[in-house]
């Protein structure tokens, strides 16, 4: 999802203040690592501040890959208590390294859709967000460059798009990876990797963050971004009428993101209470407001300007082993 901002947001009884990074040794301090978007962080700060006025909640932003690498390296000595909205592939990796606490039996996972609680993660992870991707365009930039709306991935290989495409790096971003994986499923590995070799001259930058492409579109730096539907819709609903979400015949790639407790941290009452709140209230609330692609059963959210009847790409087999094997062949 998004890049490290070197910012720590702390919720205090008296209000919100900036603090420096440090281990959350105080039993009333809960440190959360996340790659989620600014608007979700703002909502989380508000909700947690109201629910837990006597706790100090520290939220540190990092990319999905940075979160996994740091928690794996530090283990139970990590400053992090809760990993929030982490991509499932990286959560699988953390599980394999033994750096997450088991939540088996603590929560009613039957509330969640079956595909969000696969056997590979269901003893450690609470589902949080289903995030689909689309080809996001800036209509003004296209018009200024005399370009029409692309209708296929191959359209983006034309030299007229030189430097006008943005995509997150699959090696650092779950968003970037889901686009790569979806095309591997649609075309086969050789053709998909060859496509990105051909596309790279037209890519302004492979961003560290999954939010990077939409931000570049908003800043009119590019005309086309391989981005998150939810982020584009948030910009549209905030008054940006230049953006539009397109889908190609291969379908919309999709990723799942979840929450987990770092090894040894569940014993802290504050950490467990915050995790309980994320499960009982916050996931539904953030999905209702920003992420209507469902993770909970019996939900039907209506977010303004969010595309309906999305046809998703084939993402079957998207597991840690497949991810590591594919990323070993990514050279950009």
What are these regions (language model features)?
Residues 23-93:
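Early extracytoplasmic/lumenal segment of secretory-pathway proteins
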